[in-house]
Amino acid sequence: MSESSSIKRTLIGRVVSDKMDKTVTVLVERKVKHPMYGKVMVRSKKYHAHNEGNSAKAGDLVEIVETRPVSRTKTWAVTSVLEKAIVV
């Protein structure tokens, strides 16, 4: 394969659930401009990401990268925890 196909998509989002083993649910928010009115809106999507060492917990800010399918719903993997959640 060529080197251009090895570029992986990465996203940054907040972990909203870590109740599954080796899996976290990551909420990724993006800003889009309304095509007619021009207002900037926030759109969000949830991704299931593979978390091998169960290192990411709920509330953490994580970076996820696209990988080969691990299961029916998991095609993303956690690469790093950027910010830990504040425990109260």
Curated annotation (Swiss-Prot):
Part of the 30S ribosomal subunit. GO terms for molecular function: rRNA binding; structural constituent of ribosome. This is Small ribosomal subunit protein uS17. Disulfide bonds: none annotated. One of the primary rRNA binding proteins, it binds specifically to the 5'-end of 16S ribosomal RNA. Gene3D superfamilies: Nucleic acid-binding proteins (2.40.50.140). Belongs to the universal ribosomal protein uS17 family. Keywords: Ribonucleoprotein, Ribosomal protein, RNA-binding, rRNA-binding. One of its GO terms (biological process) is translation. The keyword Coiled coil does not apply. GO terms for cellular component: cytosolic small ribosomal subunit. It holds the Pfam family Ribosomal_S17. PROSITE patterns: RIBOSOMAL_S17.
